[in-house]
Design a protein with these regions (language model features):
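Flexible active-site lid/hinge loop adjacent to a nucleotide/diphosphate
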Residues: 1-63
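Residue-level signal for inorganic ion chemistry
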Residues: 16, 34, 49, 68, ...
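Short, ordered loop/turn segments at secondary-structure junctions
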Residues: 18, 73, 194, 221-223
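A short helix->loop->beta-strand "cap" motif at the edges of active sites that frequently abuts
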Residues: 44-47, 64-67, 184, 244-246
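Active-site flanking residues adjacent to catalytic metal/cofactor-binding acidic residues
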Residues: 50, 163, 191, 220, ...
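Beta-strand->loop->alpha-helix junctions that form or flank phosphate-binding loops
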Residues: 66-90, 108-114, 138-142, 251-252
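C-terminal helical cap/extension that packs against the catalytic core
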Residues: 206-260
Length: 260
């Protein structure tokens, strides 16, 4: 939309998934426009590595000019995941799975959930496109951690703390669905929403947390030029919609919220 990468050509472009976001004043008018701009990447790269399972893949790739390499769970995927298994200890959440298709490999990733499987498949496919040896790909995936993405914060063996960037309804639902799969005794979420951004994020995140968390702590998160109290009020609307009986507290000061 702002042509920030105009004139830049890429060796490899990657499509992971897409859902409604960045729609509103100063951003995109519609989801279709948002998707169309995302698709421009595949007119500016030599190879496109794409998630064949995502419902938006076909529309996003309309008019693409690159060679495509696919990954996912569909039988026709070039790199296909099978045998997905959750891994857990007191200080570790991860996954392991088997890859078939153009290559065979057992993969272990030090990050939890289904989305980590898809991200690992994408990274594996990019590695193959770039000609990396299988052992380097295997070892790299086994060591990979991403700051702020389901990042484990080792504080106590009595409970597990994870730090994640989830900032809209879809990413929050994906995260909490992932954590629920590990059957936690109690799931507590501390979160807020950014100011001067679409209110749909606030309603959506509030609704999902009300449905999926055992307890939520609503707090500030870069309010920009809005009042924190106004943002929390919008989140509360979503909470009440998701579950009128949801248990939560509002603590505007983030440090106080973390101490709570």
């Amino acid at each position: 939309m702002m042509d920030r990468v105009a004139g830049v050509h890429y060796n490899v472009g990657v499509f992971t998934n897409l859902s409604p976001d960045h729609i509103g004043p100063g951003e995109h008018k519609t989801f279709e426009e948002y998707r169309s701009w995302k698709g421009q990447l595949f007119k500016r790269c030599d190879v496109g590595v794409v998630n064949i399972d995502d419902e938006n893949t076909e529309a996003l790739l309309e008019g693409h000019t690159c060679r495509l390499v696919t990954y996912g769970r569909a039988e026709q995927a070039d790199y296909r995941e099978t045998g997905f298994e959750l891994l857990r200890t007191h200080d570790f959440l991860g996954v392991k799975f088997h890859v078939t298709g153009k290559d065979e490999m057992d993969v272990k990733v030090n990050m939890p959930g289904e989305f980590s499987v898809y991200n690992a498949l994408a990274a594996l496919a990019v590695g193959k496109v770039l000609g990396l040896p299988d052992q380097a790909i295997h070892d790299g995936l086994g060591k990979c951690v991403v700051k702020g993405r389901v990042e484990l914060v080792p504080i106590s063996k009595k409970f597990t703390i994870l730090l994640d960037y989830a900032h809209n309804e879809v990413s929050t639902e994906s995260l909490l669905t992932t954590l629920r799969a590990y059957k936690p005794h109690r799931l507590v979420v501390v979160f807020g929403c950014g100011g001067n951004r679409s209110k749909l994020r606030r309603y959506g995140m509030g609704e999902i947390c009300a449905k999926m968390a055992d307890f939520s702590i609503l707090t500030e998160d870069n309010n920009r030029f809005e009042k924190v109290e106004d943002i929390l009020a919008d989140i509360r609307v979503g909470m009440n919609k998701g579950n009128p009986d949801a248990k939560f507290v509002e603590i505007p000061d983030r440090l106080d919220a973390l101490h709570y």
